[in-house]
Every structure is written in structure tokens, then in C-alpha cells.
Amino acid sequence: MRNISYFCIVKRIIRFFYTTFVALLMLFNSEASASPLPDISLSEISDSALASVEISLLTCKPHEEVYSLYGHTAIRILDTEGGRDMVVNWGVFDSSQPNFVYHFVLGETDYMMAMVSTERFLRDYYYYGSEVVQQKLNMTTQEKRKILAILDEYSKPENKIYRYNFYYDNCTTRARDVIVEAMDGKVEYPAWKNQKGDETFRDIIHAKNSGYPWCEWGNDFLLGMGSDANMTPSERQFIPEMLEKDFDSACVVERDGTRKPLVEATSILLPAGQSMADPMAGFPLSPMACAVLLLMVVVALTLCEKYVTRKEIKWLDYLLFDVLGLLGLLLVVMMFSEHPTVRVNLQIFLFCPLWLVLYSPFFRWKHREKAALGILALFFLGNIFQCYASGMNVLALSLLIRIMKNLKKSNE
């Protein structure tokens, strides 16, 4: 087990793939704690001892490391008299599994539920200076027994492993579902009444990536049309801090109609501190700045080609189109991924693998520029249906300039 602790030209390409892999890591993972305790039965806690048992929702806030931007959620079980203090965590995976990276990219990573000591769970968050908020749940003895039975069932070898899904089945949604199932009444969220319902998955991702423009760009490069769909209030709860906020005002409507708050008390289990880790060294230019800079270079070289050297700069087309085509192979792979909202991604018309054929030094076709223009037109049209990553339209203008120049020359 491990803790998800999540341009010379060749160098820049390597940096790009590094950025997109980090984006995958941070986008499709939440932080996790390792070193699970030996399998134990929560049923060992007697009914008489349940009075001293406290069940809490733990929300671990983001810290400065990129992989933590979405936070983490777990359930704490504290026996104040028996001394047992553990955390139930659905964020554990085994990176030593065969072909782990292959399965990870395709969204076929299996996560598992594990129980760790609270001290061990908090250690990493203390190191990074991350705040951990505890919401003690307002549960009856019967509800405590029920949630322990549910957790006991999940801890069985045949049940503890699950297929992780960032939006719909992650460490936060699992904790929420267990808690809601254990309550004898219906859990209602008054906070939902104030929500307009016009927030998309991409909006949430952007909010969590604030201050990290290249992470935001990497996520937007990978995310397709599905991420621009409006979320329901419950779907927003895939983010730990969203669930924490909803739980703050949530209430349980019992069978007799009486209402009680879901959360009995909220406290800071681990205060935010000074991180002992080095801050992430970001690239000095934003994605938009890089796209504008590239556009200026393309315009300058195209003008130089026409008015100064009067010779074709063929290497510019090969470099520009073929690099984008190579990067587009990643989007092709994502078409077969189980990760949510990545299969239909209209940015593939910009990062188009067909560029590798159309703009190969060994390929000659008189209709090449017309075909390229058609592909690029589909990309621009896609703005209606999908929110593109920062700088993508500017990058497309660089291609359009080269296509129109070549098209004009071929018609002369």
C-alpha cells in the first residue's frame, strides 16, 4: 500500500506528459492513508459499550501539494472508554499490482476500504500542515450499531475492493452513503434550497484548481463534454468540502416526523499548520501566455517566410502539427478509459492524430490543407458544446494561419 501523496522541444513534450499524468493523478484520486490495521470486526463492540462510541465524518482540507487539491474524506470511530480510535478510509490502493499504470490511465484502478489508527491517519496531514475537520454525528445507539454493521460488511475481503470513480464513487461518496444508510430517518439538506443548479463538474474542478493554472489546463485537456453538464446537489458531494458544508445544516427526519441535526458537534481535529514540504514550483508562464507566445512566433515566421526568405519553412508545419498529433494520442487512449467524462472530447480535433499522417514529410496529397481546414473547423464549432482548456483557441489560430498560408500557396 502507499499514500496518494497526487518547452528545446523534447524537454517541453516531456513536461507536458508529466503535467497531464499529474492531472490524471490529482483528478481521479483523493488523498489516502496507508498502513491498514489488521482485519478486525467492529461487531466486537458490545451494545453496552456503544454509549461511549462516537462516529464522526472527517474532512481533510487541501494543502499546497497538487495531489491534495480536492481533499479527502473518512469516517472516524472513537471508543472513549475502550480506547479504540480508528479511521475507516476508502482511498487506499495497491500500486504494486501488475500493469498498474496501464490500468490507472484507463480508469481500471481498484481501490479498497481499510481501517487505520487515527494517529497514523493524521500523521501525513500534520506533516503537510493540512487542517482536518471533525463532524461528530448525532446518532442513536441503534444507528451506531447499524453503521458498525455496515462497515463490518464492507471490510470483508469480498466487499472491501471497489472500482474507483472520481465523480460518482469515491472516498467521499462512500462515506456519505454509509452514514445516510445508517440513519433511521431521511436525511435532508436545507442548503440545497439555495443552490441554483447551474454549476457544472468543470466549474467545481476550476474552483479547486484556483492558483494552479497548469493543473487546471491539464484537467481541461483531459475532460470532455460530460464535464460541462450541470450537477445535481447530491452530485456536488463528490468533493469533501461540499459534503462537509451540506452536513453542517443537514437534518434527519425520523419516522414520527421529528427532526434532529445530523451533526451534533463540529471541531478542528487537526489545525492547519506550516507545511514542512516544499511548495510546488510552477511554470512561470500560464497556458494562455504560452499559446499567445506561440501564436506570435508562428505569425513572425510566416511573415518572414513570405517577405524575407521567400522560402517555405516546412519544418514549422511538421513540428507544430506532428507534436499536437502525438499529444492527441493520449486523447485517443482516453476514449477507452473508464474515467468519467473523458471519452467524448472535442479537443481531439485540435490535438488530432491525423496530423501525423497529413503533415508527414513522406505524405503528399493535394487536398491536405482542405482536409486540415475541415478538421479545425470542427474544433472551433465544438466551442458551442464544450468548454476548452485555456489557450486552446489561440493555439488553433496558429494552425489556422499555417493552413491558410499553405492553402493560398497551393492555389497559386
Question: What function would you assign to each model-found segment?
Answer:
Residues 6-9, 20:
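Short, positively charged and aromatic/hydrophobic N-terminal segments
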Residues 18-29:
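Bacterial N-terminal signal peptides
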Residues 32-36:
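Boundary at the C-terminal end of the N-terminal hydrophobic targeting segment
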Residues 51-130:
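Glycine-rich catalytic cores of cysteine/serine-nucleophile enzymes that process amide/ester linkages
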Residues 63-64, 130-138, 157-166:
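Second-shell loop/turn segments in exported
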Residues 142-151:
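Short, charged, amphipathic alpha-helices and their helix-cap/turn boundaries
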Residues 153-367, 377-412:
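Activation targets extended, charge/polar-rich intrinsically disordered C-terminal tails
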